[in-house]
Regions:
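Mature, structured domains of secreted/extracytosolic soluble proteins
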Residues: 1-377
């Protein structure tokens, strides 16, 4: 079809350019800009560089860091990829500066952070995941039926939308209120909100299990320990240039903790269902097939820690293996959306981290020592 247009139409701008012009959303844009990348494009430079008086043109992207490319007019510079060019767009649900600061003062400030700029990059990255939708433009009546890349919903009300724009690469919604993101209200909540548990958040994220613990269809009991527990187990944050990575000592310096090790740590610290820590004696199977919790009178340990003292005097050693647990509640003093969280502190460091402890063959020890004096085998 051909239409006659009797006026000059103002070209639409990218979501990124719209955000830049709206000072009320500068904090959100600062978060997003942390993940900007600039890649030289040879073809674009050759075809259009002279027209704008430059030798080199760069693509301003965010996808290398897992975020939608809200600064690019088109999802791909390849004009032959028509299906992608004709279908891919994005939607941004950006909280205003006031909304972000209100949320910060209520939750993050109480959790040990001094300002929005003091937040760890992983927290801001996941916050951005909760505020973007990649793949297509979203209209208001569709928002309640979609989920983000981590599987959680967008919890704001349409009445919170005070600003909106259709852009050349998607849609922009400006929010006057920033409610608790769904993922922050799960058993991962303490790790998102409290600085003391930040390394637990990295363990979950790098184990690729974050989406699993986002669901509210399953009820969990999760153990977390303070950052000092990870340090006892030779784990700490290492800068990767854009953010941080949970690392440990390697042959040539610090290296990222393996996904398999972190999966064992996180799964071994999680039980499906409720746990009664005040029982006189109970054993609970964790999500890690080789890890069990031994629970006794408000304290607990794991089979790995317990097995490490085989051959020693049980009367003096066993009491030292059990550690007290303390429930970590939400801001209302209750459980989290999909279960309960308990903090533990152990001289052994992080449960499930075997490095640094001597674990000889259990079969050899049992046959050579004869552990009839231990009641818990």
């Amino acid at each position: 079809y051909i239409y006659n247009v009797d006026r000059v139409l103002e070209p639409l701008e990218t979501i990124y350019d719209v955000l830049k012009k709206k000072s009320d959303y500068s904090d959100f844009l600062d978060f997003y800009s942390q993940y900007s990348t600039y890649a030289y494009d040879k073809d674009l430079s050759a075809d259009y560089g002279k027209a704008v008086g430059v030798d080199s043109l760069f693509l301003h992207a965010h996808s290398p860091n897992g975020l939608p490319n809200i600064a690019l007019e088109w999802p791909t510079p390849n004009f032959r990829l028509y299906p992608e060019l004709a279908s891919i767009s994005y939607s941004i649900f950006a909280p205003s500066n006031q909304a972000l600061n209100t949320f910060f003062n209520r939750y993050w400030k109480a959790g040990g952070y001094s300002s929005l700029t003091d937040l760890d990059p992983l927290i801001t990255k996941i916050l951005l995941y909760q505020s973007v939708y990649g793949g297509s433009i979203v209209f208001p009546d569709e928002i309640s039926g979609i989920t983000n890349s981590l599987g959680s919903h967008y919890d704001f009300q349409l009445s919170d939308v005070k600003d909106k724009s259709i852009c050349v690469n998607g849609s922009f919604y400006g929010l006057s209120n920033f409610p608790m993101p769904e993922i922050f209200s799960t058993v991962m909540g303490p790790s998102f909100l409290k600085r003391d548990y930040l390394l637990s958040l990295y363990a979950i994220f790098q184990s690729n299990q974050m989406a699993a613990y986002t669901t509210t269809a399953t009820n969990y009991t999760m153990l977390i320990t303070k950052n000092s527990g990870y340090e006892i187990s030779d784990m700490r944050l290492m800068s990767d240039g854009v953010g941080n990575t949970l690392a440990t000592s390697g042959e040539d310096g610090d290296v990222a903790v393996s996904t398999s090790d972190l999966k064992r740590i996180v799964s071994g610290g999680t039980v499906v269902g409720d746990v009664n820590f005040n029982t006189p004696w109970a054993v609970y199977a964790t999500q890690d097939g080789g890890t069990y919790w031994f629970v006794k009178d408000g304290k607990m340990t794991t089979n790995y820690v317990f097995n490490s003292v085989l051959g020693q005097d049980p009367q003096t050693v066993i009491p030292t293996l059990f550690t007290e647990v303390k429930e970590v509640t939400n801001d209302a003093g209750g459980s989290w959306a999909n279960g309960k969280v308990y903090e533990y502190e152990s001289d052994f460091g992080v449960f499930g981290k075997l490095d640094g402890l001597e674990y000889p063959s259990l079969r050899t020890m049992l046959t050579s020592i004869g552990e009839t004096k231990y009641p818990n085998f």
